[in-house]
């Protein structure tokens, strides 16, 4: 049996996931990473990504994870994020509309917060890919 760790994923609205996990794959500003039990402690900024976790029962769960903070220590992994969604919770039409709006904002450039628009585009693309 694989070693596990406590995992808690929290959004402003709810506790998205709380339980034991064998591993979780996600993406930080430094790149893609995989967290296993007894991982060295660190804190990182998360970017929107399609993530995957393996529960203590060996069940694979895929989900969308928005920006946030990842805190890892030897006892647990805590993710505080803007949003987390299972594939069945994602409204594909809404995500496609968000993608279109972000692309339109980026094409204008004047008076547009480019970083914010790029972030919105990345988030929409990842949500669409998840469904």
UniProtKB/Swiss-Prot annotation:
InterPro entries: ATP_F1_dsu/esu_C_sf, ATP_synth_F1_dsu/esu, ATP_synth_F1_dsu/esu_N, ATP_synth_F1_esu_C, ATPsynth_dsu/esu_N
Annotated GO MF terms: ATP binding; proton-transporting ATP synthase activity, rotational mechanism
Primary subcellular site in the record, as a coarse category: membrane
Domain of life: Bacteria
Gene3D superfamilies (UniProt xref): ATP synthase delta/epsilon subunit, C-terminal domain, F0F1 ATP synthase delta/epsilon subunit, N-terminal
Keywords, sorted A to Z: ATP synthesis, Cell membrane, CF(1), Hydrogen ion transport, Ion transport, Membrane, Transport
Role, per record: Produces ATP from ADP in the presence of a proton gradient across the membrane.
Subunit structure, interactors included: F-type ATPases have 2 components, CF(1) - the catalytic core - and CF(0) - the membrane proton channel. CF(1) has five subunits: alpha(3), beta(3), gamma(1), delta(1), epsilon(1). CF(0) has three main subunits: a, b and c.
Name recorded for this polypeptide: ATP synthase epsilon chain
The encoding gene: atpC
